[in-house]
Curated annotation (Swiss-Prot):
Protein name: tRNA (guanine(26)-N(2))-dimethyltransferase
Function: Dimethylates a single guanine residue at position 26 of a number of tRNAs using S-adenosyl-L-methionine as donor of the methyl groups.
Encoding gene per record: trm1
UniProt similarity note: Belongs to the class I-like SAM-binding methyltransferase superfamily. Trm1 family.
InterPro entries to which the protein is assigned, alphabetical: SAM-dependent_MTases_sf, Trm1, TRM1_arc_bac
Highest taxon above the source species: Archaea
Known EC number: 2.1.1.216
Keywords (A to Z) from UniProt: Methyltransferase, RNA-binding, S-adenosyl-L-methionine, Transferase, tRNA processing, tRNA-binding
Lineage: Archaea, Thermoproteota, Thermoprotei, Thermoproteales, Thermoproteaceae
Residues annotated to bind S-adenosyl-L-methionine: R39, R65, D83, D109, A110
PANTHER family found in the cross-reference section: N 2 ,N 2 -DIMETHYLGUANOSINE TRNA METHYLTRANSFERASE, TRNA (GUANINE(26)-N(2))-DIMETHYLTRANSFERASE
Catalytic activity: guanosine(26) in tRNA + 2 S-adenosyl-L-methionine = N(2)-dimethylguanosine(26) in tRNA + 2 S-adenosyl-L-homocysteine + 2 H(+)
Length: 351
């Protein structure tokens, strides 16, 4: 295997040479440099939550995510890395040694490993190529009470409903076409995890959920207990969208998307604490503001255009705030904003 030495965050590691293999997708071991932000934000989250953690990454690739957790978060007591590829497992060992990190390395099927680690892990991070859905049940088997589950999904087109049959088959949900389809896709992922959690008698509380171009990412605190699982399911339901109207419901109809997570997508306080580290602080600041608004949707400026002309985002936010409506930009659309008011009230404030 042809390798190159790379650096990300505070670690160095070997990865397949993309020039030799043509693309990252053709290489014998997968490493995607475009996921650096994903990994960095995850490190900041663990650093914020505290130490002494048993962390498992069952789809490790080069091992860079787990190694960064160990080196940068200062929160890892035991690190378990795994990949079904024998080449990947050997490369993980090489990268652990390069960084002086102690870790257990396995060459196994991810679900088999997670079942073997029953009730062992404080953190399970599912970072697959495609959908995390096949691994979520097993992840809950591996998690301890009061643990953390992180999941990345790159099958964004499925989650936003572009492929309805696959969305129903994979996530047991339907997502309609709306101006805020990105948010529905993210809530689709979190809602799926919440329902799987409940089937394993776990509740979830999202700490950080976001969209970044080609993927969705969520990290949820989990707690064991049937009663808490029942309570968490109160945050699962449907979003109804018709022109000029948005509402939530517990029963589906021909205009609804769901079942989705209707509750908060993250914790504003944790985002504020993460931002203090000075890395991706602007992005974390946007998330902090978004998470403080309960509505499970956002608005887009073209929805309020008159003769094809709509206010700028800055103008819209100013008008809303002058009308006493709390509003903030959203990271999910450059022309989008969240507001603690209904469509009619927002429209009256803008015009």
């Amino acid at each position: 295997m042809n390798l190159v030495l790379r650096r990300e965050g505070a670690v160095q590691f070997y990865a397949p040479d993309p020039q030799r293999y043509g693309s990252i997708y053709s290489a014998p071991v997968f490493y995607n440099p475009a996921m650096e932000k994903n990994r960095t934000l995850s490190v900041l989250l663990l650093r914020t939550l505290g130490g002494g953690l048993t962390v498992c990454e069952p789809l490790s690739g080069t091992g860079v995510r787990g190694i960064r957790y160990a080196v940068e978060s200062k929160a890892v007591a035991r690190l378990v890395l795994n990949d079904i590829s024998r080449d990947a497992a050997e490369l993980i060992k090489k990268n652990l040694e390069l960084n002086g990190v102690d870790g257990e390395v396995y060459n196994d099927d991810a679900n088999v490993l997670l079942h073997r680690l029953k009730n062992v892990c404080d953190v399970v991070d599912i970072d697959p190529f495609g959908s995390p859905a096949p691994y979520i049940h097993a992840a809950f088997r591996a998690l301890r009470d009061e643990g953390l589950l992180c999941a990345t999904a790159t099958d964004t087109a499925v989650l936003v409903g572009r492929y309805p049959r696959k969305c129903l088959r994979r996530y047991w949900s339907t997502v309609r076409k709306t101006p805020f389809y990105i948010e529905l896709g993210l809530r689709n992922l979190v809602g799926f995890i919440a329902r799987v959690a409940a089937s394993e008698d776990f509740s979830i509380r999202p700490l950080m959920s976001y969209w970044e171009g080609h993927y969705f990412r969520t990290c949820v605190a989990v707690a064991r207990g049937a009663r808490d699982a029942d309570d968490a399911l109160q945050n699962v339901g449907y979003v109804v969208y018709r022109r000029g109207m948005r509402q939530t419901t517990q029963l589906p109809d021909e205009s609804s998307s769901g079942p989705l997570w209707l509750g908060p997508l993250g914790d504003p306080l944790i985002m504020h604490q993460m931002a203090q580290h000075g890395v991706y602080s602007d992005f974390l600041g946007v998330l902090e503001q978004e998470y403080s608004i309960e509505a499970p949707w956002h608005y887009r400026l073209p929805e309020f255009a008159v003769e094809g002309v709509s206010p700028t985002l800055a103008e819209a936010l100013d008008l809303l705030r002058r009308s006493g409506i709390y509003a903030t930009a959203t990271h999910m659309a450059k022309d989008g904003f969240k507001a603690d008011a209904g469509y009619g009230e927002v429209k009256r404030a803008l015009f």
